[in-house]
Amino acid sequence: MTIIRKKHPLIKIINHSFIDLPAPSNISSWWNFGSLLGLCLITQILTGLFLAMHYTSDTATAFSSVAHICRDVNYGWLIRYMHANGASMFFICLFLHVGRGVYYGSYNMIETWNMGIILLFAVMATAFMGYVLPWGQMSFWGATVITNLLSAIPYIGTTLVEWIWGGFSVDKATLTRFFAFHFILPFIITALVLVHLLFLHETGSNNPTGLNSDSDKIPFHPYYTIKDFLGVLILLMAFMILTLFFPDILGDPDNYTPANPLNTPPHIKPEWYFLFAYAILRSIPNKLGGVLALILSILILALMPLLHTSKQRALTFRPITQTMYWILVADLLILTWIGGQPVEYPFIIIGQTASIAYFAIIVILMPIAGMIENNILDLD
């Protein structure tokens, strides 16, 4: 068996990636989220495949086909809610994974980090298009509002929006193409994940100290396969509790009303995992400015390696920057809350303050904190 594992052209790739991979001996549970994201992706592809067998991407029947899946298909309700809540679990793991990367300075592995940002954009695009497919009120109006933002692009904006819509409004053509893209993107994401892993295995994993761990490695299997399996069990338990006991807690009640272009919902808002970016978008009164801020709210992650001023990699031994980091986390939670609130006083001013704080902490305060710590430790 050992000979096959190490000699077979295909199996040896798996062996070098998941079995005999040299891993730092001290990586904590924060390093579990990569494997959990892989599990989430597989779950989403499988449940999505079974949903696609019964779903019809036509404005006249899309809403009814989802109802049919829940009522008439064997365990259709379970597959549908696993897919919907699986997206939420996916984003929880994604945010924790990115947060880990920021905390421990993993962004210094630039290729891996940039690939991760591309993956984040791809997953967000996939989730947005998936939210349109049930063709409820929030699906329709969410698609209308978000795609309409592209009209802010000078000169080509209006033409671009109508090209994406396939007409003069969100309609049958839009739904059909969104279904096509929503189906194909997860497979593209899977390929990008392999590239992400390829880049990671070029440098090896980071660790909680931020120090070079080449002199202290252990094989991935059995140590981290067992450790990851514990994470998988915890995730599956949380996932099934959410799916079986509280399937609608993260959804919007408006999406149980069929899409009606003549009736606008009182508060148009995306799924919870986009609310922080939506709050940043809404906090700027100018349309183009809002769109740029929305894109920059994610793209700013690409600047992290350039904004790293400290001589130490991780935040483990850097209390000032640690404080900034946790203020940033709190700020993101505030933005998430604001994104779900109506556009009125005092929510507008809270959203604007939180948006300014978000960019200021990343671009100004954390780099300054790094330099102060260098001076305190006399590392300059």
Curated annotation (Swiss-Prot):
Q: Name one GO biological process term.
A: mitochondrial electron transport, ubiquinol to cytochrome c
Matching entries from InterPro entries are given as: Cyt_b/b6_C, Cyt_b/b6_C_sf, Cyt_b/b6_N, Cytb/b6-like_sf, Cytochrome_b, Cytochrome_b_C_euk/bac, Cytochrome_b_N_euk/bac, Di-haem_cyt_TM
**Binding, heme b b566:** 97, 196
Q: How does it sit in the membrane?
A: Multi-pass membrane protein
Q: Where on this chain does heme b b562 bind?
A: 83, 182
> What residues does a ubiquinone bind to?
201
- Listed GO MF terms: metal ion binding; ubiquinol-cytochrome-c reductase activity
Q: Which Gene3D superfamilies match?
A: Cytochrome Bc1 Complex, Chain C
- Xref: Pfam families: Cytochrom_B_C (PF00032), Cytochrome_B (PF00033)
Spans traversing the lipid bilayer: 33-53, 77-98, 113-133, 178-198, 226-246, 288-308, 320-340, 347-367
Intracellular or extracellular location(s):
Mitochondrion inner membrane
The cofactor note reads: Binds 2 heme b groups non-covalently.
- Entry keyword set: Electron transport, Heme, Iron, Membrane, Metal-binding, Mitochondrion, Mitochondrion inner membrane, Respiratory chain, Transmembrane, Transmembrane helix, Transport, Ubiquinone
Q: Name one GO cellular component term.
A: mitochondrial inner membrane
Q: State the oligomer form and interacting partners.
A: The cytochrome bc1 complex contains 11 subunits: 3 respiratory subunits (MT-CYB, CYC1 and UQCRFS1), 2 core proteins (UQCRC1 and UQCRC2) and 6 low-molecular weight proteins (UQCRH/QCR6, UQCRB/QCR7, UQCRQ/QCR8, UQCR10/QCR9, UQCR11/QCR10 and a cleavage product of UQCRFS1). This cytochrome bc1 complex then forms a dimer.
Q: PANTHER family, per this entry?
A: CYTOCHROME B (PTHR19271:SF16)
Recorded family membership: Belongs to the cytochrome b family.
Extra info from the record?
Heme 1 (or BL or b562) is low-potential and absorbs at about 562 nm, and heme 2 (or BH or b566) is high-potential and absorbs at about 566 nm.
Full protein name: Cytochrome b
